[in-house]
Every structure is written in C-alpha cells, then in structure tokens.
C-alpha cells in the first residue's frame, strides 16, 4: 500500500462513519412514501453539505449525505488510455449487475466512475461498520484489479507481437 493511500482511505472511512448516521424519514410530499432524499432532493433542509475526499486530481470520492440516505460516488485513477478503457468496462460490468449489490447504483454521477446509494433501510439491515469496510475494500480491490488486468493485457500484447514478428524472420 502506498504512503498516500492509507491517509486517503482513513479520511474516507471517518467521513463515511459520520455520514452514515441515518434515520427513516417519510416523504413530506406523498403520504406513506420513504424515498432517498439525496436522490429526489425535494427539500434543501434535508440535504447536508456534500464532501469531496481527494487523493489527487483523478482519484476522489464524493459523499453526499441527507437525512435518510447517503450517495457515494467514486472516481477511479486512470493514468492512461488502457486504464480508462479497462475502468469503463469494469464499472459497466458492475453496474449491469447492480441488483446483486444492494447499495450499488445503476448509473454513476457525471464525472465519477461508480456510485453507491445507502439508505436508512440498508443501515438497519446491515452493520454500518461492515458497509464502510465493504466500500473501502472495494476501493482498494478495484485499483488492484485494473492494474492486474493492465499487466495481463500488456503481456498478451507482447506475446502476440512476438508471434507476429516471427513470420518476418
């Protein structure tokens, strides 16, 4: 783990722990409805100040808390064109399977690669610290996965190029 990753993850952890103090809050517009206020944004007084935790210009997390939900959007580091393509394919693959991940949103916010929506119902059904651990583990693993895919892709490209060039010798 790099020297800047640990403080970044700790800052995200503490911010998420503070933001996940959620409670059930019925809709002020429609009776017997409970919608995530961070998504519908009907009342400004129910939304809290969004927080951006950034490791660098490309790698950042946007945490948008409200009274009954939190939306977490993650921008994944993409240093070159290969990483951009791999990241796009990987996040698209994950978003297509959002039904299997209860807190994953199907569509990320503009400027971010993947988004999660945690509601008060999720915090009642699951442990808050486990949700935070899952998000931090996800952030670590997605970076590792993309790096491993890039190494594998480069190795396959090298083998293909060698096989192609053998024909000319």
UniProtKB/Swiss-Prot annotation:
It comes from Caenorhabditis elegans. Component of the Arp2/3 complex, at least composed of arx-1, arx-2, arx-4 and arx-6. One of its GO terms (cellular component) is Arp2/3 protein complex. The lineage of its organism: Eukaryota, Metazoa, Ecdysozoa, Nematoda, Chromadorea. It comes from the Eukaryota. InterPro entries: ARPC2/4, ARPC4. Belongs to the ARPC4 family. One of its GO terms (biological process) is epithelial cell migration. Disruption phenotype: RNAi-mediated knockdown suppresses the memory retention defects of the msi-1 os1 loss of function mutant. PANTHER family: ACTIN-RELATED PROTEIN 2_3 COMPLEX SUBUNIT 4, ARP2/3 COMPLEX 20 KD SUBUNIT. SUPFAM superfamilies: Arp2/3 complex subunits. Pfam families: ARPC4. This is Probable actin-related protein 2/3 complex subunit 4. Keywords: Actin-binding, Cytoplasm, Cytoskeleton. The keyword Cytoplasm applies. Its main location: cytoplasm. The keyword Acyltransferase does not apply. Functions as actin-binding component of the Arp2/3 complex which is involved in regulation of actin polymerization and together with an activating nucleation-promoting factor (NPF) mediates the formation of branched actin networks. Seems to contact the mother actin filament. Plays a role in time-dependent memory loss and the retention of conditioned behavior over time. GO terms for molecular function: actin filament binding. It is found in: Cytoplasm, Cytoskeleton.
């Amino acid at each position: 783990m790099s020297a800047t990753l640990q403080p970044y993850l700790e800052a995200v952890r503490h911010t998420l722990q503070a933001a996940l103090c959620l409670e059930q809050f019925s809709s002020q517009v429609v009776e017997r409805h409970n919608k995530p206020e961070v998504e519908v944004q009907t009342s400004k007084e129910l939304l809290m100040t969004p927080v951006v935790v950034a490791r660098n210009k490309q790698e950042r997390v946007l945490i948008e808390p409200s009274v009954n939900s939190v939306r977490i959007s993650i921008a994944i580091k993409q240093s070159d064109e290969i990483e951009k393509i791999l990241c796009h394919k990987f996040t698209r693959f994950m978003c297509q399977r959002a039904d299997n991940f209860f807190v994953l949103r199907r569509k990320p916010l503009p400027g971010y690669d993947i988004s999660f929506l945690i509601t008060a119902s999720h915090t009642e059904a699951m442990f808050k610290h486990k949700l935070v651990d899952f998000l931090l583990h996800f952030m670590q693993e997605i970076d590792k996965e993309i790096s491993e895919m890039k190494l594998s892709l480069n190795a396959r490209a090298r083998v293909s190029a060698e096989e192609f060039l053998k024909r000319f010798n």
